[in-house]
Structures are given as structure tokens and as C-alpha cells.
Amino acid sequence: MAEYCDIYNEAGTHLGTALRSECHGNPALIHCTAHVVVIHPENGMVLLQKRRMDKDIQPGRWDTAVGGHLAAGESFEEAARRELSEELGVSGRVELFHLFDSRIRNEIESENVRVFGAKLSGPFDFQRSEIDEVRFFSAAELTDPANRQNFTPNLCTELDELIRSGFIRS
């Protein structure tokens, strides 16, 4: 089944829809994604997912625990909750809190990203068709340059914002 995303101009005006597959590979198609930073409620560690080696983009690298494109007509929060369920098997009542918004612009795609936080400890029934592994990382591990070589560029940008805002203390 074809998946469609709403597309926007730089000013945020809705222009229509495009196939999700078209949004990757065409940076002119600005679309939206929702990410969820999962924080362990007891120790503050941050959950990351390791992308499968057969992924088209950033295979085998550590990434934000939850992230996905908004389907056409879907809100950021609806997408975040859907992705929590699909990627980590988490459903039901989960408190999401807004952390920040960002823009990702590169040669592959252009995304407007809303980043939420959620305090969860697991267990997680992660989506094995997309994810090889999930695990919690300490602040020291998240800021270690040796580890960052194995993180996606988007994750590094997100972590830098979380550190800058004091949400993660290095």
C-alpha cells in the first residue's frame, strides 16, 4: 500500500501530498517526522535503536529510539504514538512531552522534526524487521566521541540540542 506524506514549503504552507518514497531522495519535498526520545524513569539513561544492516539510510548505526514520517493528515503526536507502538511495541497511555522542533536539510531529504520525550523502562518488543537492537545509553556514552562515530548524523544533532538545553548532562 502506498504511503503518502503531506509536503510543505519553507514557510510551512501545505502544498499537497507526495509518496513517502518520493520524499527520500528529493530534498525539495519538505515533509514532517516525529521522534521520541525514550528516557529511563529511574536513571535518566536514553534508549537508542540500532538500525538493521539492510536499511537504505544509515544501516547498522545507532539512532533515536523512535522516529517516523507523518502520514498525510496525521498530527505529530499521532505519529509519535503510532511509531512507539510499531517500533517498540509500546501502546496504551504514555505521557509524551514536547522537547523541541528542528529542521533536517541534506542531500537526501528535508524534514521538519518534532521531538518528544517519554519516560519508559521497558520491556520493549521492538520491530525486528527494522531494528537490530535497542539499549539504554548513559550520558557519558552518548557524549563519547568513539561512540558517536556509530551514531546517525541526525541522532548526533538531536543529542547536541538535548545537551545544549541541559536535558542531557555531559
PLM regions with names:
Residues V90-F97:
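Short, structured loop/turn "capping" segments at alpha-beta junctions
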Residues E22, G60-W62, A72, H98-R103, ...:
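Nudix hydrolase/Nudix homology domain
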